[in-house]
């Protein structure tokens, strides 16, 4: 299997950005900003699910999967950190992230479910993200005129 490369993305998120950062378009900016607000909670769920899933494997399989899991966790932690920085600016502009608290509450209510269910949700969500990313690559107009550093 191909090794996961954890990219330490260096994006300037110290400098504020405009609320309509996506080409001045209110809808496109709000759409992608709302997505960003949902990501940190989801990424932490993915990390927790994969970490718990690894623990459930027999010792031999744990050893085989450890590096891959470490790479996945590193990648997700990097994404979470970047979205948290982005979301901090959104909050400073007055955007209220009500999704995160509700998502955390739902995740806690489902904590009793089998780790396989959590891994299935993780895999399905990652697949959706990959399909969405592919769509984005084929439709650059979705980010036309966006703040270049974002």
How should each PLM-predicted stretch be described?
Residues 1-150:
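Non-heme di-metal
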């Amino acid at each position: 299997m191909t090794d996961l490369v954890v990219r330490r993305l260096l994006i300037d998120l110290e400098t504020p950005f405009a609320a309509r950062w996506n080409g001045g378009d209110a809808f496109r900016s709000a759409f992608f900003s709302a997505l960003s607000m949902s990501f940190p909670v989801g990424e932490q769920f993915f990390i927790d699910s994969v970490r718990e899933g690894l623990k459930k494997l027999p010792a031999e399989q744990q050893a085989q999967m450890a590096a891959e899991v470490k790479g996945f966790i590193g990648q997700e932690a990097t994404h979470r950190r970047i979205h948290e920085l982005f979301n901090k600016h959104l909050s400073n502009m007055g955007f209220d992230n009500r999704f995160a608290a509700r998502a955390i509450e739902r995740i806690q209510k489902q904590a009793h479910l089998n780790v396989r269910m959590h891994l299935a949700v993780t895999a399905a969500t990652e697949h959706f993200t990959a399909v969405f990313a592919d769509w984005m690559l084929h439709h650059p107009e979705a980010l036309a005129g966006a703040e270049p550093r974002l």
